[in-house]
Design a protein with these regions (language model features):
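Glycine-rich, Trp-frequent "lid" loop and neighboring beta-strands that shape
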Residues: 153-211
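Secondary-shell segments that build the walls of catalytic and ion/ligand-binding clefts
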Residues: 238-300, 305-307
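Phosphate/diphosphate-binding glycine-rich loops and adjacent basic-rich segments that engage nucleotide
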Residues: 189-260
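N-terminal mitochondrial targeting presequence
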Residues: 1-35
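Active-site cofactor/substrate anionic-group-binding motifs, chiefly glycine-
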Residues: 89-143
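Catalytic-core signal marking the mid-to-C-terminal active-site face
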Residues: 37-53, 288, 297-400
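Acidic, glycine/proline-rich low-complexity segments that act as flexible tails and inter-domain linkers
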Residues: 37-50, 55-74, 79-80, 87, ...
Length: 400
């Protein structure tokens, strides 16, 4: 299991309590899951068909007042996250969206509006509706502009948590475009040499098409790890690796409790000597594209992270870009395929079986889901879904 976990640490920012061993070069999933249950003391996963997960999310969101089409957009994204293996941003996040609608900090019945527009750019007001609805509107607008004039650059204010950034960049890839998506987030990250958190994990996604349905899909935070990994370490009462967080004195700490109690996350790279200032710079770049260009909340001015009892509107800023490679040198997908294959063909280090490119772990997870006829969930996640259904008086999630 060691090589599996190392591979996941390199390419993904998952809550590792949620089936982190699923991505493996071997797709003999029954044996893999059995091994996980025996060696890691984890119960066997429960499989649920994608269509059923999708219908369940829609049922829940409509029950709390979201428009049907908005609920569908959110469900598209959450199911995609779980299908791709990003369990921290799929069904696991449903309660957050429900609480935002029920609590009135997110609006369930408006639409995004365009406030400024040129042939290549647009400035959108999300009007405080669900982030995935805003994001879908913006990336589709960017793609349309890229088809017409070669590039589409769309910024939005008044948005909310939009899920995995890769979902939007992949929309562009499906249209033969290069896609980019960025969002600012609640300030949990301590900038290099600072004492307090002032920036979000501010994710970046860049995706590009290659031949034969291959692609490059980078989807990463600009912090070293996701907040969920630190929370998980605290629950397990285990120490953390270097570079994950600092205590309230600004000193690097291996104690998750110290990081969560007045400390903060470290930028990608960790300490300054290890290049953390570069992650800090990337997080500020995302703020430039998202908060500064759009006039949304930004940096330390964004509301604090709270998934249960939120009282403030998020007013997140987001940025979506589509580039038409046909406007540049011929043979783009050929070269992209060549580069991908050159990386995959590199000799792996001892203990590893293959070199992956961004997007490969997700492809393996999707293949595994397809082979098993559904998405694998931890039994606790199914229990949570059952309790959620009962609280909303909707039909339970049906398992395979």
């Amino acid at each position: 299991m060691g090589s599996i976990c190392r591979r996941i640490f390199r390419f993904k920012y998952l809550d590792m309590n949620n089936m982190n061993g699923l991505i493996n070069s071997t797709l003999n999933s029954n044996k893999l899951f059995s091994k996980m249950a025996n060696n890691d003391q984890e119960p066997a996963p429960v499989f649920v068909k994608k269509d059923e997960v999708h219908a369940f999310v829609v049922r829940c969101m409509v029950a709390v007042g979201a428009k049907k089409e908005h609920a569908v957009s959110l469900s598209d994204l959450l199911v995609s996250a779980d299908y791709r293996g990003h369990f921290s941003h799929g069904l696991n996040r449903l309660a957050m969206y429900i609480n935002d609608i029920k609590g009135g900090t997110t609006v369930g019945n408006k639409e995004p509006t365009i406030e400024k527009e040129t042939v290549a750019t647009a400035f959108v007001n999300g009007n405080n509706i669900l982030g995935p609805v805003v994001g879908k509107f913006c990336i589709e607008l960017a793609i349309k502009k890229a088809k017409d004039v070669g590039i589409g650059w769309v910024c939005a204010k008044g948005s909310n948590h939009f899920g995995i950034a890769g979902w939007y960049s992949i929309r562009a890839v499906e249209e033969g475009m290069v896609g980019m998506a960025y969002t600012n987030t609640s300030p949990n990250v301590v900038p290099t040499r600072a004492l307090v958190p002032a920036l979000g994990t501010n994710p970046i996604s860049v995706a590009a098409p290659a031949n034969n349905d291959d692609s490059f899909v980078l989807d990463m935070a600009t912090s070293t790890v996701a907040l969920g990994k630190i929370e998980l370490a605290k629950r397990k009462e285990t120490s953390m690796p270097n570079g994950w967080g600092v205590d309230k004195e600004g000193q690097e700490s291996n104690d998750p409790g110290a990081v969560l109690d007045g400390g903060g996350q470290m930028p990608l790279g960790g300490s300054e000597i290890c290049g953390g200032y570069k992650g800090y710079g990337l997080a500020m770049m995302v703020e430039l594209f998202c908060g500064i260009l759009s006039g949304s909340s930004f940096g330390p001015n964004i509301r604090k992270w709270n998934t249960v009892h939120q009282t403030e509107e998020a007013n997140l800023g987001q940025c979506f870009v589509a580039i038409n490679p046909a406007m540049f040198a011929d043979g783009f997908t050929d070269r992209m395929s060549t580069l991908n294959d050159q990386m995959r063909d590199l000799q792996p280090i001892e203990g590893e079986t293959e070199v992956l490119v961004p997007g490969d772990p997700e492809r393996k997870h999707m293949q595994l889901c397809d082979s098993e006829g559904g998405i694998p969930y931890h039994p606790n996640q199914i229990k949570y879904a059952t309790e959620l259904a009962q609280s909303l008086s909707v039909e339970d999630l049906k398992t395979n």
